């Protein structure tokens, strides 16, 4: 009963959050931040959290130089946490591993979060960001979940002017990619 009550509480919280995001009632607190500092802080937190769960974590920053991004730090952290939470939920290897890579792709930075979990079938992959979509395997598992976590992630990334997608190989793992536009100062002509 306790576990079911917790699951219901989580579902209510996710539905409330999704409703606020969907109706543009969530207040975003955008700030200009250093991409390097922000993602290194995220990586430090993930390293501790995943280490406590005996899951390997590798962080790599491939950006040649630091740049600024305009983000809501709390909401972007929610994106990363939701993706990592999904990876952990469906991790089926005794030696779980999660990777986080930051890359420079023109006017954007690209964040890649990969795992060595069970992967997602090609049939299900196009729908994983749809509201309430759950794969047949997750519906039949004891893993729980509401089917709105990744739709929340997609909405937040899009509200940041970005895009999100995934690649996956069954039995080998999944990688989620999202891009966030770099901050660029526009010179003012005098």
Where are these regions (language model features)?
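Short conserved segment of the HATPase_c
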Residues: 120-132
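A conserved beta-strand-to-alpha-helix junction within the catalytic ATP-binding
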Residues: 29-47, 102
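Conserved micro-motifs of the catalytic ATP-binding
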Residues: 23-28, 66-71
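Short alpha-helical segment of the dimerization/phosphotransfer core of two-component systems
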Residues: 3-8
């Amino acid at each position: 009963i306790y576990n079911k009550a917790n699951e219901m509480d989580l579902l209510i919280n996710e539905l409330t959050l999704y409703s606020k995001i969907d109706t543009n009632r969530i207040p975003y607190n955008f700030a200009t931040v250093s991409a390097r500092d922000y993602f290194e802080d995220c990586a430090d937190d993930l390293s501790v959290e995943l280490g406590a769960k005996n899951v390997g974590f590798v962080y790599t920053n491939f950006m040649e130089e630091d740049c600024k991004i305009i983000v809501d730090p709390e909401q972007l952290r929610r994106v990363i946490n939701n993706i990592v939470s999904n990876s952990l939920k469906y991790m089926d290897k005794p030696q779980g591993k999660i990777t986080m890579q930051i890359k420079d792709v023109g006017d954007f930075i690209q964040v890649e979060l990969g795992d060595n979990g069970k992967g997602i079938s090609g049939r299900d992959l196009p729908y994983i960001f749809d509201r309430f979509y759950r794969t047949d395997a997750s519906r039949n598992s004891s893993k729980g979940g509401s089917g709105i976590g990744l739709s929340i992630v997609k909405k937040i990334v899009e509200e940041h002017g970005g895009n999100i997608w995934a690649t996956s190989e069954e039995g080998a793992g999944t990688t989620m990619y999202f891009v966030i536009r770099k901050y660029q100062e526009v010179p003012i002509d005098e």
